[in-house]
Structure formats: structure tokens, C-alpha cells
Amino acid sequence: MKEFALRTLTSVVFVAVMVAGLLVPYAAGALFLVIMAQSMNEFYRMALGGSFRYVTGLSILACGTAYIVLYGIRAFGLSAAWFAAPVIVLLLMLAAIVLSCKVEDASRIAYVFVPQVIIALPLMCTPYLLFPQGQMDGTLLLSVFIVIWLSDVGAYLVGSTLGQRPGSKRLAPHISPKKSWWGFFGGVICAVLIAAILHFAGICKLGIWHTLALGAVTSIASVFGDLLESLWKRHFGVKDSGKCIPGHG
């Protein structure tokens, strides 16, 4: 009960911070920058422990700098020449790997590049979603998060009822034994319905078919992203990948 209360409280706070960040001008840039840095740091701690801190630090700095430049381009018309800054940091990271890491470290050092692809790269797209026409409009990203949050609730409700019946097929039993196909499709259907509501409420300004597709794709991507995270945690033998948000590992 205490764990549930903690999860609920932190969820409410997280949602409030995300909504405020997406609606308050220019706050979203700082919000996603912090999320990127913390998420990458948590992955590195899970995968590498305290090893290669100088390399992982340069990796986070390079991705963070690239995000700042992209945000500056969309929000303030910053010159693309500023991309030289993250490129220089990235080259320093590669130099640090080549000059200081041993041959037997090669398989482990490869984990340095994983969060650059699965965490930093998607977040680098957010400035283009926040400034679709040159002016800040956080409603599209807000719609994405609303779909994720509520489809997750729908997936849980359907999965915990219909998905627990005898004979119900598991989605990926070797990774997450509790996830069922009932929950998966329940979440997708819920996501499409929520997306439609957001469209007709005027929150999501995309066309109706694009909005419905956004709902379905977002739900599917969130499920398999969650499974990928569970796969990493099983691989590294950890229960939680991080402790930044209490009650949410």
C-alpha cells in the first residue's frame, strides 16, 4: 500500500511537471535536456557501473550540447554552425575511447553508444515538435504524453482482467511474464480512442487520420520501449534501472 501511494504521488507530480513544462514558453527545452541527461546517466550506471566515467560524461555532454543547438535553431534562429560544438565534444569522446580503453573493454564500451540512439536521438526531435511553425506549440507533444499515460492505464485494466484468464497468451513471457496480448490490444484501442477525443477537443491539431495513426503508433512504441527497458534490466540483473523517480524503476 505504501509503495502504491508513493507511485501515485510521484506520478501526479511528474504529470504536473510535464504539463507545465510543455505549456510554459521555453520551459520544455530545459525539461527535456534534464530528462535526456538523467536518462542517459541512469543507463550508464546500470550498464557500466562506475566505469568509463570520463567517456560517458563526454557522451552526455555531446548529446546535451546537440540538443541545445537544435533547440536554439528552432526557437531562436541560431546558426547551424553551432553544431561544431557537439561534434568537437563527440570527437573528444571517441579520442578518449581509442587512447585510454583496453582491447578487452571493447564489448563493454559499446554500451556508450546505446543511449545516444535510444534516448538522445528521439529527444533531439522534440524541438521540431515544439516549434512546428517557428512558434512554440506544446500541444502536439502534450497529446503524445496523454495518449501514452492513458493507454497505459487502459492496457493495465484490460490486461489485469481479460489478460489473466486461463489460456491468455503472454506478449513476451521471457521478458515480462505479466504482459498479455489482451493488454497490448486494449492499450492500442484505448490510445486510438483518446487520440480521437484529443482531436475533436481541439488539443491535437493534426488531421483526424494522422491523429488516429499517432495514437496507435505511440501506444505500440511505448509498449515495445518498455519491453526493451525490461530486457536491459534482466540482462544486467537489476530490478530498477534508476532511482530518480521514487516508486518508478
Predicted regions and their residues:
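Membrane-embedded alpha-helical bundles of polytopic integral membrane proteins
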Residues: M1-A216
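Extracellular/periplasmic solute-recognition and catalytic clefts
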Residues: A221
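Interfacial loop-to-transmembrane junctions
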Residues: R234-G249
